[in-house]
Amino acid sequence: MEQTYVMVKPDGVERGLIGEIVTRIEKKGLKIVAGKLMQIDRELAEKHYAEHIGKSFFEDLIGFITSGPVFAMVLEGDDAIATARRMMGKTNPLEADPGTIRADYAVHTNRNVIHGSDSPESAKREIQLFFAPQEILSYQKAIDTWI
């Protein structure tokens, strides 16, 4: 089973969207194998967004992601990365397909409610950044025996 990292950003947490987003994830068939509400500090934010160091928007990005709590998750399922990304929609909510999380809830590219890994490599890196191995659980959902 493939794993991916997904995070409800501060704007999503502050607007009370964690439950709605988790419901969508579970209804889609992805399994949450780790999850926690946390405050990201600058050091972790810089590691997470290392590829953007030196870009004009970097400081705003760090300021936003450290401005409030996030809900970090590890999801598991067949094709979990692509499935989660389709559910999220395009980065710019104005370009996101109707019915996606960003189209339905995001108001601006810089405040787009949710983050998700874009490749197996980034998923592995992000999961290791945000979760210790013992925080990631292995379990079988009741429905799995029927699939």
From Swiss-Prot:
Record keyword RNA-binding present: no
Q: What does this protein do?
A: Major role in the synthesis of nucleoside triphosphates other than ATP. The ATP gamma phosphate is transferred to the NDP beta phosphate via a ping-pong mechanism, using a phosphorylated active-site intermediate.
SMART domains, A to Z: NDK (SM00562)
Q: Which UniProt keywords apply?
A: ATP-binding, Cytoplasm, Kinase, Magnesium, Metal-binding, Nucleotide metabolism, Nucleotide-binding, Phosphoprotein, Transferase
Per the record, the major location class is cytoplasm
Q: Which GO terms describe its cellular component?
A: cytoplasm
Q: What class of enzyme is it?
A: transferase
Q: Assembly and interactions?
A: Homotetramer.
Per the UniProt entry, what are the Gene Ontology biological process annotations, in alphabetical order?
CTP biosynthetic process; GTP biosynthetic process; UTP biosynthetic process
GO terms assigned for molecular function? ATP binding; metal ion binding; nucleoside diphosphate kinase activity
Q: One Pfam family for this entry, by name?
A: NDK
- Provide the reaction this enzyme catalyses: a 2'-deoxyribonucleoside 5'-diphosphate + ATP = a 2'-deoxyribonucleoside 5'-triphosphate + ADP; a ribonucleoside 5'-diphosphate + ATP = a ribonucleoside 5'-triphosphate + ADP
Quick one: which gene encodes this?
ndk
Q: InterPro entries, alphabetically?
A: NDK-like_dom (IPR034907), NDK-like_dom_sf (IPR036850), Nucleoside_diP_kinase (IPR001564), Nucleoside_diP_kinase_AS (IPR023005)
Q: Which CDD domains match?
A: NDPk_I
Q: Which cofactor does it need?
A: Mg(2+)
Q: Please report the name of this protein according to its UniProt entry.
A: Nucleoside diphosphate kinase
Annotated transmembrane regions = none
* EC number(s) stated in the UniProt entry for this protein: 2.7.4.6
Q: Which compartments is it annotated to reside in?
A: Cytoplasm
Q: Which residues does the annotation say bind ATP?
A: 9, 57, 85, 91, 102, 112
Name the active site residues: 115 (pros-phosphohistidine intermediate)
Q: Which family does it belong to?
A: Belongs to the NDK family.
